[in-house]
Amino acid sequence: MRIINSKEQIVIILRPSRIDIEFPRINKNLINKLLEKAQVILSDLSWILEHPLGNRIAFRSDFCIFDDELNAMRALSKNLNVVTNSNETTEMSIRLNTPEVIQGEPVNIVTNINNAIIGVKKDQEETKRKSSLITYDVNTVVTNTENRFEFETLLPYYEEMINNVFERSEHFN
């Protein structure tokens, strides 16, 4: 199900096991306010999902935060506190990419820094966790969707991916 708030241009997509929130045309100075708004939306909608596998905030914006800007990613995600009504693990991922970046690369490498509270609301202190997730998507433009999950397509980039994982994990705290 796709819900569109035309006034604020927020798109909420309810999937079988995930809630996606997309904010198009983001002003860099308003990100913290948008994160707070997304947090409220996710908390309000979390009861819909019996077994949520993840919550994703997707920013479609005029700027991009690249993999090497970890401090900026940490600043964006440090205050995320989304607690679902389920004991299932919930993952909050923040992805910031301009359409130009996604369309201009054969492989879209995105660092997701996650700091979400997971689990039942009464157990907030026991369910905190912090994680660094590095994802690699084959270009997700419409013309290339059939290759998105084919491992063979990623093979030419395998060494770069491994190096990226080790480098990012060494600096994550």
What are these regions (language model features)?
Residues 29-33, 69-72, 145-153:
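Short, conserved charged micro-motifs
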Residues 1-24:
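N-terminal low-complexity, intrinsically disordered segments
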Residues 1, 5-7, 27-32, 103-117:
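Generic detector of solvent-exposed, compositionally biased contiguous segments
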Residues 8-9, 44-50, 80-84, 139-141:
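Signature of extracytoplasmic/envelope-associated structural regions
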Residues 22-65:
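Aromatic- and glycine-enriched beta-alpha-beta binding-site module
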Residues 13-15, 51-53, 128-132:
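Solvent-exposed loop and beta-edge segments used for protein-protein assembly and interaction
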Residues 108-173:
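Mixed-charge, glycine-accented linear interaction segment located at domain edges/termini
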Residues 57-137:
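Aromatic/basic-lined ligand-recognition segments
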